[in-house]
Swiss-Prot record:
Ranges in coiled-coil conformation: 92-123, 175-204
Primary residence: membrane
InterPro entries named in the record: DUF3713
Any one Gene Ontology cellular component term annotated for this protein: plasma membrane
Bilayer topology annotation: Lipid-anchor
Family from the record: Belongs to the MG307/MG309/MG338 family.
Lipidation (N-palmitoyl cysteine): 27
Protein name per its UniProtKB record: Uncharacterized lipoprotein MG338
Lipidation (S-diacylglycerol cysteine): 27
Signal peptide range: 1-26
Record Pfam families: DUF3713 (PF12506)
Comp. bias intervals (Polar residues): 958-967
Amino acid sequence: MAHRFKRWSLIALAFSGVGATAIITACSTINTANLFPTLNRSQKLIGFSDQNIINPDVVLKSALNDGSGVDSILRVSFGSALQKWYQANADRNISNRLKIFEENVEDEHDNLIDEKKRADRVKWPIEVQKEYDQFGGNQESWKKLKLYDRLITDFQSLIFNNISANVSLVNSSDTSVATTKENIEKTENKLKFINSNLNDVNGDFFTNLQAYLFSQWLIEENPFLLNQASFNYQSPIAGLGSIYDENAIGASNLNLSYNFPAFQDPSESGGQTNSAKLFEEFDKQLQTANSSGSSQSSAATNTRNDLLDFENKYSASKVLISKNNILSVLKTVNLSAAVIDQYHYLLNNKTELTTTTTTTTTTGGTSSNLNPLDKFIKSSSATTVMMKSAMTKSQEVTSDNNGFNVKSEFLKINPSLSSSGSDNSSNTQSFWKQVQALNNSSQTATIFDAVRMESNSSQAQVVTSNLLVSLSSKTTQKQQQKPVYVRGDDAIYAFHIDGGNYFLENSSPNKRNFEKQAEVLLMRFLQGQTNNFSKDNVSFSVDLFGSNSEFRSWANRNTTLKLYTALTTMLENGTSNNNGQKDVCDLAKKLLKNNTNLSETIKKQQDFNNSLSQIKSSYESYIKAANKLNNFRTDLANIEKLEQAIVDRANNYIKLQKEAKESSIGWGQPLPYKRANDGSYPSLAKFFNNNSDQSSAQTLTLKTTAAAITSDNEPTREKNNQTLKTLTTEVENKAKELVEKWKATTYSSSQYSEIITLKSSQLNDLDLDLILSLLTDSGIRTGTVANIFKNWYFKNTNSFTNNFDTSNKELKGEFSDFNDLVKQALYIRSWQNLTSKERFGYYKDLGSVNSTSTMLQMQNKAAQSHTSSSVNQTLLDLAKKAFEKELEDPNQDAEYKYMRFLQALMWLVKNGAQNYKNLLQQAIPIGTRAFVSWTVGYDKNPSATVSQKTKSSTSSANENPFNRFLQNPNYTQGSEINWFNDKQTPIQPDSLLESENTYRFTDEPFNNSVALSNKSQGSSDKKYFYGFNGLTINSNQSISTASAGLTQQLFNNYGQLITATDKAGALSQYKDKFTLWSLINKTSSDAELNAFGELLHRSVNVDTNNLSRFNSRGEPLISFDNKKKFLLNVVDRLDDLYFHKFEGYVGLSKAANTDGSNTEGYKTVQTVPLTNDSSIQTLSYVIQITNDDVNKISSNWKNNKANSLGLKKEIFMSLLIEQALDEGTQELAFLDLIRENQKQHQREHQQILVGDKRLYDILGQTLAINAKNF
């Protein structure tokens, strides 16, 4: 990175005022108008900002586009509607509640006034106004909002007050129907929301709302119950070291976990609960239940509803899963992914259920107590699971299977275990012996993260009738749902989606039958309440409607919007689908006892009805668009969370590889879900996004046919981004329509107010004015308004606009030569700033900024990439996407930062780079070392091991390492293990490189004779120099990315680099011998002479140790005059070569390179560690920079190296770009722009006058001045 200077301190603007003292007599009164003048004087500014930079339309659109507009609109309009519902309610208790709330608000207001008066008897009106400003700006709006907030909260509590009691059977006297598993078929169409309080005149109204909200939750959140059983890992009595190789793994790393699972042999349990024994019992019961298709006493199942109950002894539970909680409820991402896979597996494979009975045959004679881990490991050389279970040829492990081939360097088994000879050992030891035997043989052991049990009723020729196969295997026969087994961090888990085969219907338009899904949830809810399953050792409860339930948590998010949507849809009785709620309304009616007309209970109150209709008429199109956008953003957030969790999991294993701790990986493996070329996981993402084409994949983790692979791995990121843009545009268009209709104007609500409020100039509506006030508050606080203000300076200053191409967002005129280099630098910088680079996909080549794809081209490329044999994206393609993603977010200040950077670059370059020259003259005075450098990882004699790991370059061994583009430096793209499970396995990483500047590159710093020859012959291949560090200065103000090893060599130990034939660079910072001689001769300080002595010692190996020594009396051994004389004599005898600049390769030694004459000098240079404690070897290319170079900078720098620090033009331009990225430099340049803007617009002050304190607080005094001061 280029030299950067510490942030220049700015002189804060100071304002002072003269206080006035008022002497008040006992009989006088206070003239508050004089004591507290209007804070924003009308004659100066009643508006957000001077020059109309921020106007009402900007503020309102910012609030509406941000999505917060829905809450502001409904907080007022729906609160007002509810006030009418309370007022005219037939239930006197309801109308009385309104009166109580109104009295409470009055009391709260009185208390507020009293409190502020007690705190300050003089300034209390100002403090009260601050409270008003948070609620619309005046007393009336404050009271209204306080009342509306109370009504909305109370209304919600009334709705959910008795929801549990309202869920029952149509015939409530037959309580056994819903609580006995043998009778669950009798609940069909009989589980309803029924008004349980017939004396409540609002009972039917609330019951309808309950059914509607429950239906909306079910359709939006897709909740279902997950039957879960777990079998904890147990260490053998002899410890984990008896089965794993503790010496190879390390005792501290060997713990029961996903990587090192174990089960205790039943013979070792000593009466304690044994997980292996329980698992065997569970598995047999489950297989029996699935093969018979009948209801079993110990694994209660039913053929119609696909319901299953696990016994308590299996640590069983029913977990309510929804798309918003699946990642938090389940402990690890592989568990969540397995459940998602099971969901889609059922959705896409089931045709109809079967009750065909199959015969279960136990294999292996009378042997039992098999190790549960046997289910997760297979041999590729036979049709057998690791122990006894048979597999058919069609199900055997192939390269298409999503298992993971065990590597002996990962899974280290105790070497003392052997499968030779007779085996009288326990079953647990037998299992591990066979695992060890596989490790020692040519066979490949394949392990699985999760497996699914399948019934082979159609395959009579197979010995066993029940198998466990990987999640990637497809089943075509008709069958009952088969649970999935998953390896967790602490146990093996069994998962079964309760009723999954019953309510998931691939043939239906919605992929699931909402009515059946509701039936399963409600039936289980009633069962859990009565819990008559104790005789079967089964018990559970389902918290469906409690205050902490998922349903209530969902209802508490955006409550007002949900209530408004429910009521307005019910008002139409679902006759139209304008708000996308017809499915919800249809389900709600089915869940009500009489399929009632939902609108009847609302229309009984005409005023309430009219108010709802008015809201719908005024705001429906905007609310619908904003709600759709918000829901999609929530889906994307869930998808991002899932993908990040998978990436984090993979990176944990990559880290072990990087640290050469492969033995700690053990049973660790990639997850079996394929990642698309754009870094997304389409098969899992579809669970969260209702808009995805779920029918495009046959089975979402299947790898059996080309068609299935294609559809399953189709990239989704660009498609989602395009959808997000479309929805965002729709919201912006609807917001624009509202703002144009309102025609808002500014006013100051009080002489004590520090803020600006809005009102409609066209509509005389107090509630609308209150909405505008709320929108103003939220709009100002969005990043959009502040960014518009900041960007105004650039867009309204001639020196910037004259040199900025607004259509292409790049420089023009005399600065256009910088565009390619700017893109290069900013793209790579955005790429480096990514915390998860893997999520943007993969690349093979660097590419070029002149050939980077547009966003549309990238989208088309991603969509077609599944048909290509290779990934066509380049690094600069992906880096551009990262940069554009930053730039497009309106709430971020990326565009402001970008223009601020461009302004800084123009400021540095103008007038012959004079400002850059001024900065460098301060930073590199005579005697200060500085250099430009490049650093790469390098080992000229790599060991066999390192050479094996380093395969990222196919270049010739003689290629200069600085010219080499590395595809996978330091595991940037993962490892050859393919931990991310990409379509294309990443290339093996280059483990030598550990530099943040790996992909920062420039032109070659010298004129390479070979490259010039190729160019003359018509070759267009351009060689770059990678690992660019920029300018490094030996100064406390310097910020450099050069390695500590390199700076130590050049700043402190240069004497160790010089030889009898290569003395250049030792004292080049002094230009020549005379300059250094003169500085020493002028010195009048003993300490300075000692410093010169130390310099000569470190630079040219002169023995100067005696110069700073003292005698026993504390006196210098050598007098001041003799020191000076000695040092001057040393300088006189120095070879002039010491003062020549050095350019060339530097490590523990150095090799000069002048004008490309020694381009292979790197072969003779010994490398240096990256840092003092690093084993990574690095090599650097260095060009020294001196004060004399700085002084020669001039307007001719583009044509003469002597005027560009002795560097090629492109490298000098790269330094200017790096300096422009420095915040301190940007601040200086921006202040210069502000001064020019002031002069151009003939303002009294440099900053812009701002009339709203909220806006001023956000902008700060560099950009704005508070109008209250004038």
